């Protein structure tokens, strides 16, 4: 039987807002997980105590941003519209059905000018403390990786810029060991100070050296005119876009421990030091670092193993000549300090370059008559050069860890930890691209997104734990009153 619904839109009804929100709603779980009044202690120094108009409750502002990131809303303007229409959002903020909600520009202005990066860091650390107090944090093994975030910039609006080359964190330590290695082999140590240009150079060699040194101090980058802080991210032959890179660390339960945002053209290994230092400072109980092959660099291996930790990484494909001998056929002899080639001929030490690679070169008279020279070298002077980093032993320690069952199984968890964090952030929380511009704004945006993800996981786990505990208590009380003997 066809029934026509009534369109009585002027009906007056008395309701309780709490009854309109389902008992298992996500915001109920989030509200029960933490005490949001802790936010007042963090933002109190940012407000004047006895002057100015009464402000909007800062807890409400933070809750609105949490709603945006929890549900993957694209902008604060859209979030403000949803808050004014959604009963559950109003209940979470503590607003009645007819009370006016904050304007999106108010939220945007406060997070741009009032709440600084330190405020966001305090909120991030506070949620991690709540997770640790609940017993869900497990930082013994830390998983580190990076993911790109598409920037709000057009790839066609770009310019070429010459910028100073960034100095490496380990440059001083590396140069000291390079000079020590050169002196041990009777070589002259490198001069760290660049040579000054004389008024009347003696020969052209000095000019070439000065030009080469000056050129090495700068690099050419593609810079966006819309957002100069982002970088050109290149992956493969076709993917080129302006982006930011979120270098992130998480534990085995998927809780984000730290994140560092850089331009998209910064390699993962370059940003590793900052992420690693922050994680180990906040969580000194870290025992293992799990990362992919992009982090298998000599200085990273040395840094991790010198700290008494283990680096668990993947197999890194060697970059050898196509159709040539396998890399493992060139064996380093530590006793004689030489390299044996596949034809069992020694490659003796020649020099150590500034990058930390001792060079071992063959005898051209022997290589000229070698039957497998075409598979070894194509140089005109018939000299084969093999480089071996002075910190190569630390890379071999990482390879040894890769073959142990414990760390092999630990690396397999990357797909369900750090990769899962990135997948959820992009698919469920709208982190695939950002509408913000500037490194500072994007950094706060990413950290608040990870705050929402950590808080959501904490709320879900707390709710599930209390639910299972309630079921156990009901079952135990029923069993105590009426035990069943099978």
Protein language model regions, located:
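Hydrophobic alpha-helical membrane-insertion signals
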Residues: 1-28
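Short amphipathic alpha-helical interface patches used for protein-protein assembly/oligomerization
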Residues: 89-93
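Basic, short loop/linker segments at the boundary and entry of helix-turn-helix/winged-helix-like folds
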Residues: 23-66, 71-72
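Short secondary-structure boundary/capping segments within folded domains
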Residues: 18-20, 53, 238
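Short, solvent-exposed coil/turn linker segments
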Residues: 16, 35-38, 326, 348
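Anion-binding and metal-coordination hotspots
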Residues: 3-4, 65, 72-85, 96-486
């Amino acid at each position: 039987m066809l029934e026509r619904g009534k369109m009585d839109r002027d009906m007056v009804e008395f309701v309780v807002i709490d009854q309109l929100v389902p008992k298992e709603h996500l915001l109920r779980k989030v509200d029960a997980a933490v005490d949001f009044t802790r936010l007042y202690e963090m933002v109190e120094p940012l407000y004047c105590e006895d002057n100015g108009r009464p402000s909007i409750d800062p807890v409400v502002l933070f809750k609105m941003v949490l709603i945006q990131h929890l549900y993957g809303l694209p902008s604060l303007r859209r979030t403000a519209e949803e808050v004014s229409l959604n009963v559950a959002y109003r209940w979470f903020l503590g607003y009645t059905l007819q009370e006016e909600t904050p304007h999106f520009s108010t939220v945007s202005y406060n997070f741009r000018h009032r709440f600084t990066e330190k405020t966001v860091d305090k909120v991030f650390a506070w949620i991690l403390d709540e997770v640790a107090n609940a017993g869900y944090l497990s930082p013994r093994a830390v998983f580190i990786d990076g993911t790109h975030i598409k920037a709000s910039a057009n790839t066609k609006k770009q310019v070429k810029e010459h910028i100073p080359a960034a100095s490496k964190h380990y440059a001083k330590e590396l140069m000291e060991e390079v000079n020590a290695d050169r002196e041990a082999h009777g070589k002259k140590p490198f001069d760290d100070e660049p040579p000054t240009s004389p008024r009347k150079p003696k020969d052209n060699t000095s000019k070439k050296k000065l030009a080469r040194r000056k050129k090495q101090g700068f690099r050419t980058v593609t810079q966006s005119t819309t957002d100069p802080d982002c970088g050109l991210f290149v992956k493969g032959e076709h993917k080129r876009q302006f982006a930011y890179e979120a270098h992130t660390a998480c534990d085995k339960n998927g809780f984000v421990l730290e994140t560092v945002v850089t331009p998209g053209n910064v390699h993962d290994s370059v940003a590793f030091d900052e992420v690693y230092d922050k994680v180990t400072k906040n969580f000194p109980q870290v025992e293992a670092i799990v990362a992919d092959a992009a982090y298998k660099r000599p200085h990273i291996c040395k840094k991790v193993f010198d700290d008494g930790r283990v680096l668990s990484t993947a197999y890194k494909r060697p970059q050898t000549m196509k159709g040539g001998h396998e890399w493992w056929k060139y064996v380093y002899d530590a006793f004689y300090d030489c390299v044996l080639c596949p034809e069992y001929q020694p490659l003796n030490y020649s020099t150590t370059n500034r990058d930390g690679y001792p060079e071992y070169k063959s005898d051209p008279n022997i290589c000229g008559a070698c039957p497998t020279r075409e598979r070894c070298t194509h140089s005109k002077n018939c000299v084969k050069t093999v480089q071996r980093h002075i910190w190569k032993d630390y890379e071999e320690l990482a390879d040894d860890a890769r073959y142990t069952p414990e760390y092999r199984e630990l690396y397999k968890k990357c797909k369900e930890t750090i990769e899962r964090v990135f997948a959820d952030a992009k698919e469920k929380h709208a982190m695939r691209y950002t509408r913000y511009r500037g490194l500072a704004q994007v950094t706060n945006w990413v950290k608040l997104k990870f705050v929402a993800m950590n808080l959501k996981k904490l709320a879900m786990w707390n709710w599930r734990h209390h639910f299972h505990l309630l079921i156990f208590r009901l079952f135990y009380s029923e069993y105590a009153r009426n035990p069943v003997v099978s």
